């Protein structure tokens, strides 16, 4: 255990300085680039993590000059960066920011891109290192991957000391198991699997990174992290927002594909996996896959339910139902809410139920993990004065957003002559304790990819294991031509079916 902890501290928390490289963002005019990627790159530059040998090239279909692209990205940084724009830093950074216009399947576009990258290599000393970020709709992934290989933009021979090339793939990685297998086959034929980084931005969040440290660096937690002491676990991911302008995207995905199959499964794996032999990306991945392979199959109604929001009021504002949103079918059967119950069939978690829920247009925005411990077996507090305040289950809450931190709720005697017991809470918050701004997830993930650290990235085998679980559910839903939608009002805590899912076990959801 000591080795794991030491490597955790040395691996996840060691200072990172990125080597020279060119980052090519496919889909550079999209929302992700403006909201997340460019602000992250700007902040890494401001912090001195990216040198003047780093270059960024935006690749997209719209006609645009370098100057216009830089102006648009400057406005994006001003709008979405958590810190105020430093003009001097930006002026330096934008000189290494370029735009390349092409269709994603145009041979000439890739030929001219290759020429441009070679020129930039010479000008900025990027040593031939290339990072390609696929921030496009998923239907373009295979075309781009094939063209990277066809035009020799990706190096298949990446021996130590030679220039490297890597590819970051955004979710969704396929729509189901078959499409994920097809995309994986395309990767196997054109790239090297160990140079492909499947990005899940939840893994870049500070509190998510802290899950393994909380577990394996603290005997007080790891010793009771099992079915002997834990009654059940709840993972909640609630959003107050709807789908906004993403109607076309969400109609093709839904909540299960968008959040559950990836983000929530990663949280579940980190929470439940066995300690890896070393804190190495491959060893961590092996343990996560073991968890995915031991999850029982889901069945509609008994272990997984879905919902869709109707009109309602969110934080005092009247909002439309999902079917009234822009670019959404008026009879849409797409789910905006998923709740499920699962068990993990291994000795550590035998008999412990895990309840997961994720939804849009709910009453509150929050993502947290609640570990509810079993009550003490000792019946020492049954006297009349104690019965007025029943003993509650101890509770560990890992808050991922907002107010990142960890809280422990336990029972304590109230001062006085009567033997009255009440729950109290110890609350750790990142911002107040460390007195520093928590880094954005994409800052960490981009930096790790440039360095070549795969620890916080998922692998293709993980993705397949997750799709194997959920593809039967999606197929069953596709056969249901008339689900009872909408089945929860916007601004609520979700559909009644989700409450029934957990209440039939004599439990209830924690308040959002």
Curated annotation (Swiss-Prot):
GO terms for biological process: glucose metabolic process; pentose-phosphate shunt, oxidative branch. Residues 496-512 have a biased composition (Basic and acidic residues). It is an enzyme of class 1 (oxidoreductase). Substrate binds at residues 201, 205, 239, 258, 360, 365. It comes from the Bacteria. Residues 479-512 are annotated as: Disordered. GO terms for molecular function: glucose-6-phosphate dehydrogenase activity; NADP binding. Pathway: Carbohydrate degradation; pentose phosphate pathway; D-ribulose 5-phosphate from D-glucose 6-phosphate (oxidative stage): step 1/3. It catalyses: D-glucose 6-phosphate + NADP(+) = 6-phospho-D-glucono-1,5-lactone + NADPH + H(+). The keyword Lipid biosynthesis does not apply. Catalyzes the oxidation of glucose 6-phosphate to 6-phosphogluconolactone. PANTHER family: GLUCOSE-6-PHOSPHATE 1-DEHYDROGENASE (PTHR23429:SF0), GLUCOSE-6-PHOSPHATE 1-DEHYDROGENASE G6PD (PTHR23429). Belongs to the glucose-6-phosphate dehydrogenase family. This is Glucose-6-phosphate 1-dehydrogenase. It comes from Chlamydia pneumoniae (Chlamydophila pneumoniae).
